[in-house]
């Protein structure tokens, strides 16, 4: 999905897939504070703390509570392994 206005977001936990789809902005609960990811973001990995992942699809924000985990961002693909 590189170069587009949407990112592919996948959130999985031990219980299964919590969300799989697209988003145009995502906010994460990082260990050192919340942070946002937008399309064309530089690649990185980050640890997550207990909190809520917020993601926007068009004009609508959705929320997914998590119990920690980590996120990998690369080529507009965001993969979250949540606790």
Predicted segments with their positions:
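Compact, glycine-rich, soluble single-domain proteins
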Residues: 8-83
């Amino acid at each position: 999905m590189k170069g587009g206005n949407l990112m592919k977001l996948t959130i999985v936990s031990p219980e299964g897939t919590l969300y799989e789809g697209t988003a145009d902005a995502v906010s994460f609960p990082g260990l050192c504070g919340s942070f946002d990811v937008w399309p064309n973001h530089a690649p990185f990995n980050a640890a997550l703390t207990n909190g809520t992942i917020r993601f926007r699809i068009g004009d609508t924000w959705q929320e997914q509570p998590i119990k920690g985990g980590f996120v990998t961002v690369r080529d507009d693909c965001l993969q979250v392994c949540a606790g």
